[in-house]
Amino acid sequence: MTATAQQLEFLKNSIKSIQDYPKPGILFRDVTSLLEDPKAYTLSIELLVERYKKAGITKVVGTEARGFLFGAPVALGLGVGFVPVRKPRKLPRETIAETYELEYGTDQLEIHVDAIKPGDNVLVVDDLLATGGTIEATVKLIRRLGGKVTDAAFIINLFDLGGEQRLEKQGITCYSLVPFPGH
């Protein structure tokens, strides 16, 4: 099932836009409204599974927190394991960490050291691509463990914030279901 224009428009219309959230001047794209609609949520998962079902994916990685909501069902649809990437001190076993830049400071992500095996073909899934910093850090973690990452999938791409270009420089092909301007 290739995504039709009608299906993609349905998904786009299921995402509410909230003006001046979380601060004045921001138009927030609320993917939780898509999650509230079982038809939209199911369709988004089905379209991602269809795109990657013949790609030889061996693991799906999702980044905290909304990446879990899309990554885990995609992993199930592909018949592979799901690996969460989380904020510091949220994973119980031994982890490695990657620090990345935020607009005002830095943050860190962690992954279990035994979650990715050398040679795993990994798909990264998240709800939204903006500047790409979080996904770039996630990709670095996977590669440090020997995993191969060439693709990342998103529900929303805020296309004018530069995330796709940033990830392409890291050898990552980005796919998103719904493009929106970021400003």
Swiss-Prot record:
Its EC number is 2.4.2.7. It comes from Salmonella arizonae (strain ATCC BAA-731 / CDC346-86 / RSK2980). Homodimer. It is an enzyme of class 2 (transferase). One of its GO terms (cellular component) is cytosol. HAMAP family: Aden_phosphoribosyltr. Belongs to the purine/pyrimidine phosphoribosyltransferase family. GO terms for biological process: adenine salvage; AMP salvage; purine ribonucleoside salvage. Gene3D superfamilies: 3.40.50.2020. Pfam families: Pribosyltran. Catalyzes a salvage reaction resulting in the formation of AMP, that is energically less costly than de novo synthesis. Keywords: Cytoplasm, Glycosyltransferase, Purine salvage, Transferase. This is Adenine phosphoribosyltransferase. Pathway: Purine metabolism; AMP biosynthesis via salvage pathway; AMP from adenine: step 1/1. It is found in: Cytoplasm. The keyword Glycosyltransferase applies. One of its GO terms (molecular function) is adenine phosphoribosyltransferase activity. It catalyses: AMP + diphosphate = 5-phospho-alpha-D-ribose 1-diphosphate + adenine. The keyword Manganese does not apply. Transmembrane segments: none annotated. Its main location: cytoplasm.
